[in-house]
């Protein structure tokens, strides 16, 4: 079986006009995905919604997979921007408060465009972007690792890097299933409470060991 080609833009926009065109195309792709779904998201349809020629689309994106990848990257950047701000505000908070608020920020970010997030999760394997998604999600790791490092003595964590990956994987796994199967739960404070208990149950045994 032939290996799946990784979707990617045809070229990176350098000038302001080019960047503006790419933004128009990415926004049009988002609208098509949300309104019509992945199957109907063709380069011709994107050009129509964007109000540009098909040639303008192909100037920057060779196919619909690369367009969807660009949507995914922008969506992840928006989620991460929200997390960076919240984590910086929690640098000196106590453990329970920081975990609770950090998870609240993650849920709030997921609520920005849950339908889009769900569509992207469904189609990532089809566009050969699973590795890229892992790369983008991996950008959370240094943020969480830095926060764990500040609480290292309190938690008794010997390897904040590993701990960060375990925590991110656990929470992202839950959120992915919620988005796919129970999207209404994103609005429930109860989900935040359960995730807080999940994370603290992983971290608190380290606290007990450090006090022996």
What name fits each language-model region?
Residues 1-20, 206-212:
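N-terminal intrinsically disordered/low-complexity leader segments
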Residues 22, 43, 65, 69, ...:
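Short, structured helix-loop boundary elements
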Residues 77-83, 97-100, 104, 108-112, ...:
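Amphipathic alpha-helical packing segments from all-alpha helical-bundle domains
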Residues 85-89, 120-127:
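Short linear capping/connector segments at secondary-structure termini
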Residues 117-122, 130, 150-198, 210-212:
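Hydrophobic/aromatic-rich alpha-helical bundle segments in the mid-to-C-terminal region
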Residues 25-33, 79, 106, 144, ...:
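Short hydrophobic clusters on alpha-helical segments that form packing/core surfaces
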Residues 24, 28, 32-66, 70:
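Helix-turn-helix
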